[in-house]
């Protein structure tokens, strides 16, 4: 809930992606200026890097005894005023300029964070650079030794953070919209953040979380490039990446490339940078179509009972964002040969634990004593790799998009949406008279499809007897690709022999 609120807030005020949302309150306490942070390079291009706070600061790992005393500059960052009603509007004034808030979609009230007045604390970089001249990092420090063993992490320092100045309450509301065509409703969770005044009580909230002040809700880091002798450089320019001198790109250890290297786009280092699309954003989908057909074949060749069971468990995962996040974390740890801690499984609610255990069993893992163990055989490896490929895409979908995908499954329009993207012409137009697109002639079904595509930065509109998809030509994101992978995977699971 806290992570969803901070992510939602940054989407409104930080279009360039310079800030990183704090994902939990424990990390908020650890986010001190000059703290060391590890940036974990992910496997797929659409996966956002993961950041983890270390228990030391930059000064703690320098060889010289003289400690660093950073000069801290503090200023106002955001002042937001707005109301949470059925129809909400407002304007945020930030250090990045004014951002207009737009709310729409019948029956769905978008989550909007109102953290009150926020302050920005940042290190004087020029002074820090001067203080760090001729200083070196002790590479024998135990914390750094563990980083060097992993070989796919970058050392960063925290140089800026955004903190609250007032006590806030984050409340979560579960909404079920009207049924679509009398068949199925869309169940979504919305998160509201409001400043508490005079001990106001949040009513009609499923869950409420009180956040004290000051709490860090976002931060930014600078990567370090560390040489063999411990000398280091601050990577201040865009495009300049950190790391350790002995780690070349070809030396970085990625998990079981033999099982995963057949998938498209696997060797892109970071998410969020967009994809090179000289012929338009949708052209990337065309390029990967045949590979995706091949990559999801392990789903198609499963026995019907096995495939149905896996599809059923995945439907339960789609309806719960927290469970999806845990499943993605477990798969990620397994791929990197890290056994998921028993506490992670033990902390889950019994139904969630059952769903996660069932999913792992169905994709080739035995769970013994809380620790998953891969079954022998190439088939099990390919099946798990395929499942990880799909889960990693689903986990990167925007808020409530997974729930919309689940609704599309229940409405049985996933095959039509896959065909729509596959059959589109170069300019994004598709003939609605195509028999495979017949389900989309229904107005309510098409409305659900529009909302799903809109979450992936694709504007879907019906023009007479055709459907047109439009994506931003400027700064295209990876979201259309994530959507297409998600649709293809779900289609393969739901396909009849």
From Swiss-Prot:
Cross-link Glycyl lysine isopeptide (Lys-Gly) (interchain with G-Cter in ubiquitin): where in chain: 120, 189
GO molecular-function term, one example from the UniProt record: phosphatidylinositol-4,5-bisphosphate binding
Post-translational modification: Cleavage at Asp-270 by CASP3 (mature and uncleaved precursor forms) or granzyme B (GZMB) relieves autoinhibition and is sufficient to initiate pyroptosis.
Coiled coil: none
GO process terms (BP): cellular response to tumor necrosis factor; cellular response to virus; positive regulation of intrinsic apoptotic signaling pathway; positive regulation of MAPK cascade; programmed cell death; pyroptotic inflammatory response
Chain positions covered by the region annotation Membrane targeting domain: 1-56
PTM annotation (S-(2-succinyl)cysteine): residues: 45, 156, 168, 180, 235, 371, 409, 418, 491
Keyword tags: Cell membrane, Cytoplasm, Isopeptide bond, Lipoprotein, Membrane, Necrosis, Palmitate, Transmembrane, Transmembrane beta strand, Ubl conjugation
Site (Cleavage): 270-271
Xref: Pfam families: Gasdermin (PF04598), Gasdermin_C (PF17708)
UniProt GO cellular component terms: cytoplasm; cytosol; membrane; plasma membrane
Family: Belongs to the gasdermin family.
UniProt note: domains: Intramolecular interactions between N- and C-terminal domains may be important for autoinhibition in the absence of activation signal. The intrinsic pyroptosis-inducing activity is carried by the N-terminal domain, that is released upon cleavage by CASP3 or granzyme B (GZMB).
Protein's recorded name: Gasdermin-E
Organism name: Equus caballus
Lineage: Eukaryota, Metazoa, Chordata, Craniata, Vertebrata
Gene label: GSDME
């Amino acid at each position: 809930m806290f992570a969803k609120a901070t992510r939602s807030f940054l989407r409104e005020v930080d279009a360039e992606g310079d800030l990183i949302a704090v994902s939990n309150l424990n990390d908020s306490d650890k986010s001190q200026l000059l703290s060391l942070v590890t940036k974990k390079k992910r496997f797929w291009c659409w996966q956002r890097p993961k950041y983890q706070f270390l228990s030391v600061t930059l000064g703690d790992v320098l060889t010289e005894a003289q400690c660093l005393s950073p000069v801290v500059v503090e200023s106002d960052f955001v002042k937001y005023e707005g109301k949470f009603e059925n129809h909400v509007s407002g304007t945020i004034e930030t250090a990045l300029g004014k951002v207009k808030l737009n709310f729409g979609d019948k029956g769905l009230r978008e989550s909007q964070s109102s953290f009150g007045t926020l302050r920005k604390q940042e290190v004087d970089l020029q002074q820090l650079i001067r203080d760090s001249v001729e200083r070196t990092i002790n590479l024998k420090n135990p914390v750094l030794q563990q980083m060097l063993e992993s070989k796919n992490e970058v050392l960063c320092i925290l140089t800026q953070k955004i903190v609250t100045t007032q006590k806030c309450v984050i409340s979560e509301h579960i909404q079920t919209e009207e049924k679509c065509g009398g068949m199925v409703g869309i169940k979504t969770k919305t998160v509201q953040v409001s400043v508490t005044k005079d001990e106001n009580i949040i009513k009609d909230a499923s869950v409420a979380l009180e956040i004290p002040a000051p709490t860090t809700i976002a931060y930014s880091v600078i990567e370090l490039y560390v040489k063999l002798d411990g000398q280091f450089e601050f990577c201040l320019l865009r495009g300049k990446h950190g790391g350790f001198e002995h780690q070349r790109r070809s030396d970085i250890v990625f998990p079981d490339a033999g099982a995963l290297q057949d998938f498209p786009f696997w060797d892109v280092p970071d998410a969020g940078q967009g994809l090179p699309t000289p012929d338009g954003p949708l052209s990337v989908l065309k390029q990967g179509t045949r590979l995706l057909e091949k990559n999801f074949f392990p789903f198609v060749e499963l026995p019907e009972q096995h495939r149905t069971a896996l599809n059923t468990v995945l439907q339960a995962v789609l309806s719960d964002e927290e469970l999806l996040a845990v499943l993605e974390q477990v798969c990620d740890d397994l791929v990197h040969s890290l056994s998921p801690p028993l506490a992670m499984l033990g902390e889950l609610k019994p139904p969630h634990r059952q769903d996660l255990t069932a999913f792992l069993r169905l994709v080739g893992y035995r769970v013994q004593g809380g620790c998953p163990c891969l079954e022998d055989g190439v088939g099990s490896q390919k099946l798990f790799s395929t499942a990880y490929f799909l889960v990693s895409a689903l986990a990167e979908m925007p808020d409530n998009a997974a729930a919309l995908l689940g609704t599309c499954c229940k409405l049985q329009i996933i095959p039509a949406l896959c065909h729509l993207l596959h059959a589109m012409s170069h300019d994004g137009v598709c003939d609605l008279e195509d028999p495979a697109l017949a389900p989309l002639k229904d107005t309510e079904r098409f409305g659900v499809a529009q909302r799903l595509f809109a979450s992936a930065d694709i504007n879907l509109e019906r023009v007479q007897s055709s459907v047109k998809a439009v994506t931003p030509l400027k700064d295209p994101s990876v979201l259309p690709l994530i959507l297409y992978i998600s649709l293809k995977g779900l289609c393969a699971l739901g396909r009849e022999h």
